[in-house]
Design a protein with these regions (language model features):
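Catalytic cores of RNA-modifying enzymes
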Residues: 1-102
Length: 102
């Protein structure tokens, strides 16, 4: 199952509009929209299919989708209830995805 679009900007704008979401500044939210930044982040982490990745504040899951392609398991910790719904809808079919929302 391929969940992401052709680029992070398009994906982010689509999800923000679809779910009527704006950044919650009190939670320090911002959204990754630059594919180069995402790709460099994932590459510099040197993630393999043996790795467990813990992602704090996955937001819309733009980085999460890249991590799921590389890691054995991704545990995402999210506090925002609106984001939890989106993450569940996007990644519930991934066997290597776990969402913690406490």
């Amino acid at each position: 199952m391929k969940e992401r679009m052709e680029n992070a900007y398009t994906e982010t704008m689509f999800l923000l509009k679809k779910y009527n979401i704006t950044a919650n500044k009190s939670l320090g939210q911002n959204f990754l929209i630059d594919d180069d930044v995402i790709n460099k982040t994932v590459a510099s982490a040197e993630i393999t299919n043996e790795d467990l990745v813990i992602e704090i504040g996955p937001g819309l899951g733009t980085l999460t989708s890249r991590l799921l392609e590389k890691a054995k398991k991704v545990i995402a910790i999210e506090l925002d209830k609106k984001m939890i719904k989106i993450l569940q809808e996007r990644f519930s079919l991934y066997s290597n995805f776990e969402l913690i929302n406490e």
